[in-house]
C-alpha cells in the first residue's frame, strides 16, 4: 500500500510539473510577442511592459503588465483557459489598484491570452469587455474591439 501511495505521489508531482511547464511556455510566448512590437494594444501605445509582477499588498501575480502615463493593460495568460477563469481576470483591475496605488486613477484594460480558445469562452470575454489574445499559427491575434476600461 505504501508503495502504491508513493507511486501515486510521483505521478502527481510529474503531472504538476508538466502543467507548470506548459504555463511558463504560454507566459513566455505571449510576453515575447508583446515585447517585440505588440505594445499598441487597447488602442493605446504602452511604453513599459513587465512580466510576472508580484503584488505588494496581496499574493497576487500579474502575468503581463503594460504601462503608459494614463493606462494599464493587464493580461492573464493561461496555456488552456476555461470560462471559470473569467472572474479572476475581472478581479484584477481592483487588485492591481490595491497593490499599486499610484495607478489608482489610470484606466485599466484587461486581456486573456491562451493557446486554446473555444467559441463560448470568446463570447464570454466579449460580453465582459475582456480582450481575446490567442495564437494563430505563428502569429498572435488580438480581438479588442469590444473592450471596456475598468
What would you call each of these model-derived segments?
Residues 34, 62-85, 89-90, 94:
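Conserved catalytic cores of phosphodiester-cleaving nucleases, focusing on short active-site segments
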Residues 48-51, 76, 112, 134:
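Structural signal for conserved beta-strand scaffold positions within catalytic alpha/beta enzyme cores
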Residues 43-69:
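Active-site metal-binding core of divalent-cation-utilizing nuclease and nuclease-like domains
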Amino acid at each position: 500500500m505504501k508503495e502504491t501511495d508513493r507511486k501515486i505521489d510521483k505521478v502527481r508531482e510529474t503531472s504538476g510539473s508538466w502543467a507548470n511547464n506548459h504555463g511558463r511556455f504560454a507566459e513566455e510566448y505571449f510576453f515575447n510577442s508583446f515585447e517585440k512590437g505588440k505594445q499598441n494594444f487597447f488602442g493605446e501605445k504602452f511604453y513599459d511592459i513587465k512580466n510576472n509582477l508580484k503584488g505588494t499588498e496581496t499574493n497576487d501575480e500579474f502575468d503581463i503588465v503594460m504601462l503608459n502615463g494614463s493606462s494599464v493593460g493587464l493580461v492573464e495568460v493561461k496555456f488552456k483557459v476555461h470560462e471559470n477563469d473569467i472572474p479572476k481576470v475581472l478581479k484584477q483591475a481592483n487588485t492591481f489598484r490595491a497593490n499599486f496605488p499610484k495607478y489608482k486613477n489610470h484606466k485599466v484594460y484587461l486581456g486573456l491570452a491562451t493557446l486554446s480558445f473555444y467559441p463560448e469562452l470568446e463570447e464570454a470575454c466579449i460580453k465582459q469587455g475582456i480582450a481575446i489574445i490567442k495564437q494563430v499559427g505563428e502569429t498572435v491575434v488580438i480581438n479588442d474591439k469590444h473592450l471596456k476600461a475598468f
